[in-house]
Each structure stands twice: as structure tokens, then as C-alpha cells.
Amino acid sequence: MAALLLLLLVSAGVLLSSIEAQEAYSQLPDNYRKGVDLALQQLISHSGVRYHYLFFKSLLKSDIELGFDVGYIYHNFYLKATKCGKGTVDVTQCKFRDDRPLIDCAICYKTFAGEIEKEPKPYVHCLHKPALTEDMKTTRVDHCRTMSYQSGDSTILASKGSK
């Protein structure tokens, strides 16, 4: 009986964490959700990916609004594998897998009127967390800082972000 109760509690915890992650995604501002969606599209396009991934949590968010509906976004976040297979349509029942490492993603892009611009090309870099080195993290940030999104002194990472 105790084993059944333990199993029930663990199952409820897994489902709750999946629901919390979906809630975290839905609470992201729209311009950040679009970036997460872009990263997920690129991730599932790889043939080696077998599971569906969901947004797990933000590590760093930064944006610059220049006016005239133009903005620049930098977002560093985690994706987490679920027990659902790649291509699952209804992801509301997908429970997180704890046997797979998180995927650490960094993305930067220009928006106009709330949409991601094709030029300059959005930068998306996602890698399993254990494989991500400090040099790679530095390279990501440097790449986003040097992207020629705008003229002037402001850069994507010059704004004060929120964690």
C-alpha cells in the first residue's frame, strides 16, 4: 500500500512539474515565446531528436526597444525532454523525463511589429547542458553583442535584463 501511495505521489509531482513548465511558457511575453518556438522548430528538425521537448525555464532575458515597433531580444533558457515522442500534437499530457540532460539554448534576434525578422538572421544555439563549456557561453554572448542589428552604441546585451 505504501508503494502505491509513493507511486501516486511521484506521478502527481511529475505531472505538476510539466504543467508548471507549460505555465512558465505561457507567462513569457509574446516576443520571447516566439524565440522559444523558433528554437524548438530547429531542434525537432534534427533527425537524431527522438523526444518532444518543452520550455523549462528562463535563465536570462534581455531586450532593447528602439521605437517604431523595432526590438532586439536575447534569451537564454532551458528545454527539457518529455516522455512523448517527437511530433506529438497534444503535449498537455507529456511528462518530463529525468534521465535526459537539459538543453541550454541562447537565442538573439530582431523583431519588427512583434514578428521575428529574417534579416539579420536570428542566432539560435542549443546544446545539451553537460556539453556546454564556458568558452561556448562566452562565444554566444559575443556573437549576440556583435550582430549588426542597429547603428549606434546600444547592443542586445547592453540593456538590463531580468532573471
Where are the predicted features?
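Exposed beta-strand-loop-beta-strand "reactive/processing" segments of non-cytosolic proteins
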Residues: 53-93, 104
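Short, non-transmembrane alpha-helical segments in secretory-pathway proteins
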Residues: 25-52
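Short amphipathic alpha-helical molecular recognition features
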Residues: 24-32, 65, 69, 118
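Beta-strand/loop motifs with alternating small/hydrophobic and polar/acidic residues, enriched
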Residues: 2-3, 38-42, 46, 57-66
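Classical eukaryotic N-terminal signal peptides for Sec-dependent ER targeting/secretion
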Residues: 1-10
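N-terminal signal peptide
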Residues: 11-30
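Compact beta-sheet-dominated globular domain cores
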Residues: 85-163
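Short, flexible/disordered secondary-structure transition segments
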Residues: 8, 46-54, 91
